[in-house]
């Protein structure tokens, strides 16, 4: 198993990734308006998230409206919702499992059980990172396609918001953390299997008895 320091580093990366994924899921700025229509004089910026749309006015007021209808949402928004929630669940499960499997903790019992728990936590972290990465990449692709579409008015074009960058960085942190946990278990198990079986040393009395029996065979 990897050293306790390396596992602790991976756990810190995982905690940062979990916090980032949860923050990105709840933030309303997955995309923001590039240019607000000139008729809306009081509006500064309009934000669009997975769960709500918000508008920030020049007066300092900030109003948000929840997206109650699920079927009316675009397919990439529905997919982003599902994959980000899945990433949050998997990363939380990975935190619980990897805590048991860490070398610096006294949970989990014997080394073999801790190794399996560490590997399971790493798989959860990697799966959560992939889920978050799918959400951010797909959502960004739709924003860029809409931005490059010449038929779309300038007022309806958007650019990626801060939540997408947070989600992308968090996905990388979770994936790296999962690789560390999984690699620590893969390196350990083959060494345990390749260890030669220990043989008890033969005493001098046994050697003398064996030699006596061999001499009697020739008499």
UniProtKB/Swiss-Prot annotation:
Any GO MF annotation of the entry: identical protein binding
Parts of the chain that traverse the membrane: 8-28, 82-102, 119-139, 161-181
Ranges of compositional bias, category Polar residues: 200-213
Membrane topology, from the record: Multi-pass membrane protein
Residue segments, region Disordered: 193-219
Pfam families cross-referenced by the UniProt entry: PMP22_Claudin
Any one of the GO BP annotations: calcium-independent cell-cell adhesion via plasma membrane cell-adhesion molecules
Cytoplasmic side: 1-7, 103-118, 182-219
Keyword Transmembrane on entry: yes
Subcellular localization: Cell junction, Tight junction; Cell membrane
GO CC terms of this entry: bicellular tight junction; cytosol; Golgi apparatus; plasma membrane; tight junction
Keyword terms, alphabetized: Cell junction, Cell membrane, Membrane, Tight junction, Transmembrane, Transmembrane helix
Key word ATP-binding present: no
InterPro entries from the UniProt entry: Claudin, Claudin_CS, PMP22/EMP/MP20/Claudin
Superkingdom of the source species: Eukaryota
Extracellular compartment segments: 29-81, 140-160
Protein's job: Plays a major role in tight junction-specific obliteration of the intercellular space, through calcium-independent cell-adhesion activity.
Family note: Belongs to the claudin family.
PANTHER family, per database record: CLAUDIN
Protein name: Claudin-20
Species assigned in the record: Homo sapiens
Lineage of source species: Eukaryota, Metazoa, Chordata, Craniata, Vertebrata
């Amino acid at each position: 198993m990897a050293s306790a320091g390396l596992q602790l580093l991976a756990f810190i990366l995982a905690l940062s990734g979990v916090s980032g994924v949860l923050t990105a899921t709840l933030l309303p700025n997955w995309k923001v308006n590039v240019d607000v229509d000139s008729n809306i004089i009081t509006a500064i910026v309009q934000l669009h998230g997975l769960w709500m749309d918000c508008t920030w006015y020049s007066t300092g007021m900030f109003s948000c409206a929840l997206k109650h209808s699920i079927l009316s949402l675009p397919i990439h928004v529905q997919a982003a919702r599902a994959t980000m929630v899945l990433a949050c669940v998997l990363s939380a499960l990975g935190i619980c499992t990897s805590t048991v499997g860490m070398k610096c903790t006294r949970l989990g019992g014997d080394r073999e059980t801790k190794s399996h728990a560490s590997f399971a936590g790493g798989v959860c972290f990697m799966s959560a990172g992939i889920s978050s990465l799918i959400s951010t990449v797909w959502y960004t692709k739709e924003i860029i396609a809409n931005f490059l579409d010449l038929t779309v008015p300038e007022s309806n074009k958007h650019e990626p918001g801060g939540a997408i960058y947070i989600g992308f960085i968090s996905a990388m942190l979770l994936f790296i953390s999962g690789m560390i946990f999984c690699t620590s278990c893969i390196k350990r198990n083959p060494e345990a299997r390749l260890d030669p079986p220990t043989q008890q040393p033969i005493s001098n009395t046994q050697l003398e008895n064996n030699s006596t029996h061999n001499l009697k065979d020739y008499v």
